[in-house]
Amino acid sequence: MGLDQYAWSRENGEVVEGAEPQFVWRKHSKLQEFMEQKFTEKTGLEAGELNCGELELDSVDLAELEHRIENKCMPISPGGFFYGHQFQDEAEDEYRDQDIMFVEWAKRELAEGNTVIYSCWW
């Protein structure tokens, strides 16, 4: 039990049932905090509404995420039991290479006209 995070893309915005995520994270609370902030900014909904929901990422989001990853200034998560926030600095270091790969992949997907989606479940 805990925070599971996923990212995938859609061609032409079409939902493909059973599609496998391209990226998976487990208890990466700083990434979750970043995504929750984006979700609230874009939708006006509470961050908790992202649970089992979807967040479309755009090039501005990805540029900010890339900057934060490169400069080790991801937002601190107040977390919760399920987020693994007690280990968020360790998770940030552990996932750094994967996070960079995610941003590079997501930018390519957007350049090809696809939609990049982030989701989570706890």
PLM feature segments, named:
Residues 1-115, 120-122:
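Acidic (Asp/Glu-rich) sequence patches and key acidic residues
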